[in-house]
Amino acid sequence: MSNQQALREPPQTATQSADASSDAGSLPLLNLASGREAVLEYFENTWALTEQLFSSLASDEAYYVRPYHKTRHPLVFYYAHPVCFYVNKMLVSGLIDKPVNQEFELLFETGVDEMNWDDLHEGGQDVWPALDQVRQYRDAVYELVRQVIRTHPSLEKPITMASPAWSLAMGFEHERIHLETSSVLIRELPLEYVKEPDVWPDWLTAPAAQNYEPVEGAHYPTNELLEVAPTRVSLGKPHGWPTFGWDNEYGQDQREVNSFQASKFLISNGEYFRFVKAGGYEQRRYWSESGWGWRQFRNVKWPTFWVQDGPAGSHRYKLRTTFSEIPMQWSWPAVVNY
């Protein structure tokens, strides 16, 4: 099976193994004027990416483990939620006329308020169905969406906002948004619940040796501020543009932007390490009001995915990636907003 075939013909449940020789990869944003076959290919690619991501869960139990911060549902919700979204949006648009599983389409419809970092969800953890039931539901919706794409008259011409098939495009992009949601939740799980997917690319090229004292210019790039000249920027997406867009992307606006400075590189782990080691997390002046509230609430002193690898105060860290724990990669961009 070729790499493209592996993405076009995904395993329908995470219990079915994908081709170990294939690499996970995303197709470009779908051109909605490109016809049924392109729409089907994009859907199957989207589905495959979700299956590949969830194949990293090492056991059924991992689907039901609550995140340590308790501000999100367990991963079983995010495995079913995008699927439920397809059904509900197709019902609203008229692509289908009856639910697949009305109980699931209520249970998995709504997530949590991602803006409330202190909104703990303490109850209701016994409401989630068995994983086999969720997999059967996913299988049924997968076949339904394929059938709609192959047969519905609205896909005989380019998909626009006025087309019932716009709901399909919305479903594709909604599912892709949740790849980030789920990947972060997987990254937050204890390692015992996670494994690297067989189809994951061999991307790690950094030295295996641990280095606790990074040197600027050797272990991470020397950064500098670059001058950006004043300019006029145009914002907004034309309504006739042949790709899906969310409502806030449309309209037209122009703004005059004054000159400013921007760093040449993203802030690396090595550069951020200096901030951490200097006690930046304990200094109120560096934080917004809500950011400081979060820092105090969590009592954090370094980024979430930096793993302490020594006694308190030693500033010895490893790096937690999505599926494993590795030596700190000082040249990689710092991830600090979780």
Predicted feature locations:
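Surface-exposed recognition segments
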Residues: 250, 269, 277-300
